[in-house]
Amino acid sequence: MSELAEKECVPCKGGVPPLKGEELERLARQLPGWEVVDEHHLRRSFRFRNFREALDFVNRVGELAEEQNHHPDICFGWGRAEITVFTHKIDGLTESDFVFAAKVDRL
């Protein structure tokens, strides 16, 4: 499991550049199953046996988001959920996005 999950999400104050290049790739290697899309956001799809399992998972992600004060975009339906993570304030990726994704993997 990634050591990223041991960290905490840090609120972004803005004015920092989004992660790019080697640093982005280094962090992405620690999150198998997550896709880096256009160097802008992280995305992962999850499958479940039914609607209730998907809903329970989404609720746990929501609780994590509130605890970490880092809020993903969530899309879900019968037997599936998709989580998209990026830092809205800078419209790109920060280390906190990778931390959050690693924490989602622990749910």
UniProtKB/Swiss-Prot annotation:
Keywords: Lyase. GO terms for molecular function: 4-alpha-hydroxytetrahydrobiopterin dehydratase activity. It is an enzyme of class 4 (lyase). Its EC number is 4.2.1.96. One of its GO terms (biological process) is tetrahydrobiopterin biosynthetic process. It holds the Pfam family Pterin_4a. It catalyses: (4aS,6R)-4a-hydroxy-L-erythro-5,6,7,8-tetrahydrobiopterin = (6R)-L-erythro-6,7-dihydrobiopterin + H2O. CDD domains: PCD_DCoH_subfamily_a. Belongs to the pterin-4-alpha-carbinolamine dehydratase family. HAMAP family: Pterin_4_alpha (MF_00434). This is Putative pterin-4-alpha-carbinolamine dehydratase.
